[in-house]
Amino acid sequence: MFKQFPAIRPYSKQFIAVTAPHKLYIEESGNPDGIPVLFIHGGPGGGTATSDRCFFDPEKYRIILFDQRGSGLSTPHARLEDNNTAALIDDIETIRQTLDIERWVIFGGSWGSTLGLLYAQRYPELVMGLILRGIFLCRDEDIN
């Protein structure tokens, strides 16, 4: 059985503006000099939770959580305007650039696994590795 790491607090919280009117909530915890790992939550419409930080060893990883457009602490909440898959992939890349990360590990669950795979297809040179759980590929047979 998987044992999660102890609860930790973020050392950084911020909002970054993407396509208007959207602003993404981003937090970082763990080791600022560690291996960067981006946690992509499920949904659409979900959000991150404090327990999402506990998947990673905080001594080894720079843990990055964000709330997707319209989700969690990102604003505006539940807004569908300019909230589509292509924009979400662009948002992930904007986060990487904003945080000045050369390459990172992508961790996605459910809808987050779909976004992680799509991001890795578009930017394979920027991805050190993929960790996927509860994989959802958004195919007809997955939906029906």
Task: Put a short name on every predicted segment.
Residues 8, 87, 110-111:
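Short, glycine/acidic-rich beta->alpha junctions
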Residues 15, 41-43, 81-85:
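Short, flexible loop segments at the rims of nucleotide/cofactor-binding pockets, characterized by
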Residues 18-76, 96:
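Conserved HGGG/HGGXW glycine-rich cap/lid loop of the alpha/beta-hydrolase fold
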Residues 77-89, 141-144:
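Catalytic nucleophile-loop/oxyanion-hole region of alpha/beta-hydrolase
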Residues 86-104:
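Conserved acidic catalytic loop of the alpha/beta-hydrolase fold
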